[in-house]
């Protein structure tokens, strides 16, 4: 019952704050608000340039290997209590990630030339 009260209170508070924000806001977009701004100067070129796909690829690779650390960290903190099966699962996980990294390196996905 207590959780239901908290859930209802949270929903009512959230909807109430959104309504108050919507009713009190003064949306008046003008040319200055929607124009590009670069350190107080007018932009020299198109301010909305597209990024090269390789930047996104590097970002995705970073996220993948960052998640690897998240998955390995609990194993490293309790390594003395891990069974033989848990150790083999971790080794297989690391081997798969290493093979993936080698494939990315060989295929040219990781280069310094952007």
UniProtKB/Swiss-Prot annotation:
EC numbers for this chain: 7.1.1.2
Catalytic activity field: a ubiquinone + NADH + 5 H(+)(in) = a ubiquinol + NAD(+) + 4 H(+)(out)
Statement: the UniProt record of this protein carries the keyword Electron transport: yes
Bilayer-crossing regions: 4-24, 55-75, 82-102
Function: Core subunit of the mitochondrial membrane respiratory chain NADH dehydrogenase (Complex I) that is believed to belong to the minimal assembly required for catalysis. Complex I functions in the transfer of electrons from NADH to the respiratory chain. The immediate electron acceptor for the enzyme is believed to be ubiquinone.
Bilayer topology: Multi-pass membrane protein
Enzyme class: translocase
Signal peptide: none
Organism: Allomyces macrogynus
Molecular function GO labels: NADH dehydrogenase (ubiquinone) activity
Location(s), subcellular: Mitochondrion membrane
Protein name (Swiss-Prot/TrEMBL): NADH-ubiquinone oxidoreductase chain 3
Matching InterPro entries: NADH_UbQ/plastoQ_OxRdtase_su3, NDAH_ubi_oxred_su3_sf
Alphabetic keyword roster: Electron transport, Membrane, Mitochondrion, NAD, Respiratory chain, Translocase, Transmembrane, Transmembrane helix, Transport, Ubiquinone
GO cellular component: mitochondrial membrane; NADH dehydrogenase complex
Family affiliation: Belongs to the complex I subunit 3 family.
Keyword Transcription regulation: no
